[in-house]
């Protein structure tokens, strides 16, 4: 199986360093139980683990499914393509943010606010793509490649 991180490394022809991908079963269990608790308390609208493709791919998938862009402030490639286990993207009603932060501290679960879901662009710091373009790539890349190959014959 090719991971997003391995593919990124291959495409850039340079190793992505300082990425620690370890499986910690206790952390997996704690964070998974925390997510279930958040759903039970109706504190989050959705949750998606980032272990397959990292944060960048997860955010793109969520944007496509919800037809809604996002703005995140982090710009680190390593951060966005790290496929470390036991991490989740959650969406919440902004009115519940303080309650979520308080509960995460109480349960000793690390929490990072990535940004906000809004607009029609996928913004990673100063870099952005239009949601329409990403949506087209996601849904049509294979058929476009096949059409392109057929046109060469």
Predicted regions mapped to residue ranges:
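Short, acidic (Asp/Glu-rich) active-site segment that either coordinates a divalent metal cofactor
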Residues: 1-20
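Glycine-/charge-enriched secondary-structure boundary and capping motifs
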Residues: 17-20, 27-153
